[in-house]
Amino acid sequence: MALAHTLGFPRIGRDRELKKAQEAFWKGELDEAGLRAVGRQLRAAHWQVQKDAGIQLLPVGDFAWYDQVLTHSLTFGVIPERFRAHGEAGPTLHTLFGMARGVSDDSCCGGAHAQEMTKWFDTNYHYLVPEFSADQQFQLSWEQLFEEVDEARALGHQVKPVLIGPLTYLWLGKAKGAEFDRLDLLDRLLPLYGQIFRRLAGQGVEWVQIDEPILVLDLPQAWKNAFERAYNLLQSEPLKKLVATYFGGLEDNLGLAANLPVDGLHIDLVRAPEQYPSILDRLPAYKVVSLGLVNGRNVWRCDLEKALEVVRHARERLGERLWVAPSCSLLHSPVDLEREDGLDAELKSWLAFAVQKCREVAVLARAATEPEAAEVLAALEESRAVQASRASSPRIHKPAVQARLAAIKASDAQRRSPFAERIARQRAGLDLPAFPTTTIGSFPQTSSIRLARQSFKQGKLSEAEYIEAMHSEIRHAVQIQEQLGLDVLVHGEAERNDMVEYFAEQLDGYVFTRFGWVQSYGSRCVKPAVIYGDLSRPRAMTVEWIRYAQSLTDKVMKGMLTGPVTMLMWSFPREDVSREVQARQLALAIRDEVVDLEAAGIRIVQIDEAAFREGLPLRRNAWPHYLEWATEAFRLCASGVRDETQIHTHMCYSEFNDVIESIAAMDADVITIETSRSDMELLEAFEQFDYPNEIGPGVYDIHSPRVPSREEIVALLRKAARRIPAERLWVNPDCGLKTRAWPETEAALVNMVAAARELRGDLARG
């Protein structure tokens, strides 16, 4: 039969045991021995559950105490000087967690900021960015991989250690200090891979998986050349080597990947099914091909019949050289569907989490040589029933939603008048001062707010009691904003647990799991909502809260919504329709809410698109199509209102240059952005492009409890006013204030309002 394997398994545990142990360790409630015991138990359980599901070659090295890239940094001795405890023989778990979370001033290292964290390709997982110096030296400094191989082999498992490849590891890092080419470090790094391979061979390992996902990116020629050189050098080292690619197609790197002097190649046929015939034609006859046929990034069951067509064809061409796997590591999938006890039977039958995906992989591998086996036939029959159910279910397919989608006209995604005409009407109606002050939406989520929400969900608070509790929080937020002298107020979002979940709970077509947790980073786990069907809004979602807030003040109250692209990017999407279609459905639902807010007397509506840039495809040639439908979805949700109603959007990331035209195409009247940490340098993109609409550059960093002085904010605003005309500038924090405490929030806003008033004085004096 074909060989069944996985590229990695979720490390958090069925009940998030790793998260609980990490946090107990950080609080001093669990010692290192206790933490390590939890790790051993989880690894043993995860290997066994994969083996029981039919996986023949088990991944080792996919477990990490915080993040797999960080584990590699410790393994290679890539530890910034600020985390090196002098006198210690080598790195410890305290070193690892210090690199991830920072070190307080009273520790042995005297205080050190954490390493930068960023998204792992186009997933919602985050990794710790390696920091390289020009004189970087590499040395094996962390024994975790070898210890875990011994653990797994002692339990009787056939193992396949997993390593991030040398080129991907260097690509993911950043040069610190003097500028230099990271490829200059390759010759220093490669000997460590040789050492690792030799040690693994000595432990009885036969195969090693080397992850090189950057092969699905647009690579400079120098990096392509480096692949050939690196793997030619590694060719002489022991072990059979499987190079794993995922998250996309190899495209122009296909020939390079196919001809690397290794023993096998894994390809993602979920994201890029079209690459299958070319790979088979280009691959040398001695190589194993691992086909990623089960989606490792989503929660839907595999269409086994469709996947089996590929397996049968591959079996004829490859014989014993065929392996079957998920498309990528199952790190991005929840752990076990069997934990779900609140889903109805039909919906649950459509889903598969990591454990179930292992079984699907095993069935496909077995079907290659035993197509008539009872287990295979039963699984195929069940899969056919699931696909038929999903194809015809009225829960999924809503004629009214589809008819509305089909009726969309180009004019529906355009405001009635150009910005210049709209802004004149808005300024006349809103009557705001120069440098108007506002916040991004949320105010501190106190323990009393969280307790009230939890008590209401558990039935301990009646609806009337819950509404009064939230009204009390809204009154408090409005009162403070009026006392501070803010110009445009918000209601504070006390009733919202999460900017996606709050809306998803109120839309038809979404479902929530109880245990569908996935790791975002470290101990942070998220439970994305699942889009299972056509999306619509049965009733207003925010209107009563905002209407109540507006009734408390004569000042302008801003409505707060999450945009369609962000809703989509932070959910598990459908696989049976495109992301574009799902974004349009979400846009129509949000459009209805915007129109209802306007009808309720709300004159400013903010539609947050925090994930707009995150949705960009990995390959540049796919950007134009994404940007076209993403900007259209925003305009569609924002264009149902009169010219007098002002539409804001908020984006929180640090790179605008390459998407500035698309941001302008969204045609929001005001965009608020995160700029304080870049000292307003981000505004250069808006200045050079001559961005036409109004801008609120964030004037202080909400991620820090530090209160900025009035003078600091004045300096930033003056810097901004040199790039953007003063009449188009707003004054606001970088982001929402949900995670801050009230004292620091009030202190910072006092200084922000004072700074805006000083700028108005400058303007008046000319």
Swiss-Prot record:
Native organism is: Pseudomonas aeruginosa (strain ATCC 15692 / DSM 22644 / CIP 104116 / JCM 14847 / LMG 12228 / 1C / PRS 101 / PAO1)
Q: Which residues bind L-methionine?
A: I440, G441, S442, E493, D608
Q: Name one GO molecular function term.
A: zinc ion binding
Its biological function? Catalyzes the transfer of a methyl group from 5-methyltetrahydrofolate to homocysteine resulting in methionine formation.
Q: Which InterPro entries match?
A: Cbl-indep_Met_Synth_N, Cobalamin-indep_Met_synthase, Met_Synth_C/arc, UROD/MetE-like_sf
Q: Gene name, please?
A: metE
Q: Which cofactor does it need?
A: Zn(2+)
Q: What residues does 5-methyltetrahydropteroyltri-L-glutamate bind to?
A: R16, E17, L18, K19, K119, R524, C525, W570, E614
Q: Quick one: which residues bind Zn(2+)? A: H650, C652, E674, C735
Pathway assigned to this chain's UniProt record: Amino-acid biosynthesis; L-methionine biosynthesis via de novo pathway; L-methionine from L-homocysteine (MetE route): step 1/1
Q: Which reaction does it catalyse?
A: 5-methyltetrahydropteroyltri-L-glutamate + L-homocysteine = tetrahydropteroyltri-L-glutamate + L-methionine
Keywords per UniProt: Amino-acid biosynthesis, Metal-binding, Methionine biosynthesis, Methyltransferase, Repeat, Transferase, Zinc
One Pfam family name is Meth_synt_2
Which residues lie in coiled coils?
none
Q: What is this protein called?
A: 5-methyltetrahydropteroyltriglutamate--homocysteine methyltransferase
Which amino acid positions bind L-homocysteine, per UniProt?
Answer: I440, G441, S442, E493, D608
Q: Which GO terms describe its biological process?
A: methionine biosynthetic process; methylation
What does the UniProt cofactor note say? Binds 1 zinc ion per subunit.
